[in-house]
Structures are given as structure tokens and as C-alpha cells.
Amino acid sequence: SFGSTSADVDCGGLKYGGRVTIYPNGYFKRGNEYVFYDFARETSPKVAIGAAFSYNDGASNAVGEGHGDFRMYDKEGKLAYPDLRKFSADILLKWAGFTLLADYTNTTATKLQNLYTAASVASKLQPEEISQMLALGNGVDVQMGYITKNGWAFNTAYSYVKPEFAEVENSALRKNYAWDVGVAKYFCGNTLKLQLLGNYTHYRTVIMEPYKERSVKMNIQLLF
């Protein structure tokens, strides 16, 4: 990846990516694909199925969006980095006020052989150590919602993240799962939203202790 200024040294190489989306039942009503709820109330089932892939040639950021967060070396003591691959697939379904949105993401690393965490042959990278530098693993997110004709909206969501090496203490990606349940009311042509949202999250802390969090929030949102 490239530095942002002349003093910001480049680390690694280029990042490549692409995405494809198909609409087996035709397109959604105008603008309805870009909001969660089926405000336009599709008269027939509309589906978008998508897949994306990216390849970061020499990653030095946990998610491949920056550079220089860590340094690695080859056996000669020169800078060298692993490659980061990310694959995701998703599906969006809308019909008569109902919405289903689900996505899956998998991130892996390659070219890990003969990498070192310091410019010394005594510090060869161990398999689990890479998870302290790169966010590697799998994630699933599923959301469902329904909106009535008079603006009442209901939704639930579940997400799960599983690191490639779940028991590494300083893993860049931590095991967690969460549930959300919400109810909302839209006013003034859907420009004002009043929402009550409940959440339960279970995850592991830095010291690998399980932690549970519960919350209830009320939100007021004005859309322009």
C-alpha cells in the first residue's frame, strides 16, 4: 500500500478487488435497494445476490485498508509482508414490506512461509502469531425486518465472528456474537424515525475472558 505523503514510506504492494451482483427477478424499485426496510413495498419478490473478492499484495494493516501498522522481514532481514485475501457473499430479498439481508465474509493470509517478526533468524513467524497482526477468520450477519403501510417497523439481527485462531490472546479479531431486536415508527414521509433497540453481545476481552453486554437504546433520527 502507498504512503500518504513523501515522508510516509510505502509498505507492501497493491490491493486488487472486484464485485458482481445479479438480480434474478429483475431490479428493485428506484432507491429501494439502498435502504434496509422495504419502504416501496415490492409487489413481487426481488432479490440481489452479490459476491466480492479482494487481494492485498503485501498487507501491513489488520484489514488491509492502511499500511505500516507492523513490520515483518524475510530471512535476509529485508522487509516482507504476507498477502491478505478477502471473500464475501451476500443476499438481499424484499417483498411486500419484508426484508432479508444476509452476508458471509472470510479472510485468509498467504505467503507466510519464511517470514520473521524481527530482522533475526531467531524470530520466525509462528502460525498463530499472524492472527495478532491480521484480522483472519469468518463472519456471518443476518438481518430481517418488516415495515407496515402506516410506518411501524420491526427488525431482528444476528451476527457471529469466528477468528481463525480463536485462543490467541492478542488476536486482531475476537470471537463474538450478538443479537439485536428493534421496533421503530416513521413519521412525516419517513423523514423522522423514533426507534427502540435492544442488544445482547457476547465476546472475549483482551485477556480472553468472556464478557456479556446488554443494552436498550432509544434513538430519534431526522433524515434529509
Residue positions per predicted region:
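Outer-membrane beta-barrel "beta-signal"
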Residues: 17-27, 185, 211-224
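Outer-membrane beta-barrel translocator/channel fold
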Residues: 54-56, 195-218
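Detector for outer-membrane/organellar transmembrane beta-barrel domains
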Residues: 21-24, 28-165
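Gram-negative outer-membrane beta-barrel domains
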Residues: 14, 96-105, 180-184, 188-193, ...
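C-terminal hydrophobic structural anchor segments
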Residues: 145-193
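Internal alpha/beta core interface subdomains
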Residues: 4-30
